């Protein structure tokens, strides 16, 4: 059994800029578990546990989902939290890109017949950089720190492929391993 998700990798230079911001934030924000730079990605759809024989059919469905899309650019900008500042659990970098909501919807549509239910939440493109177990410190203080960085630009990243990842849980944190990659430009799959 494999823990899987569908995601998009972020350009190395954007990951590096975000990592630099994390290094500046780390002393200011306590009680958070930071995501490692090599794990920065944008999740289109979390799958959970899948069986190995499902990998190929899921990859084929993914190719169908992205067929109408061509390479596009996303912009990483600003910081925010889910669900809100008073109950912060996830610290994220915002992602802007005109085709992202349509791409996520297309992926959800083709994966629904495999038993992966549609999300009941509003789609908010983001890149998780940290998670809290319990928020410590003032909510107003956290809100102020986020507001000061709301316009921080981390750069643009091309979206030219979508990846089926395996998430391997290890004592030091999750490790993400690409299982299948589908390119937006020509729908070819690679292992």
Spans of features found by a protein language model:
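Histidine-dependent nucleotide/RNA phosphoesterase domain, centered on the 2H-phosphoesterase fold
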Residues: 1-191
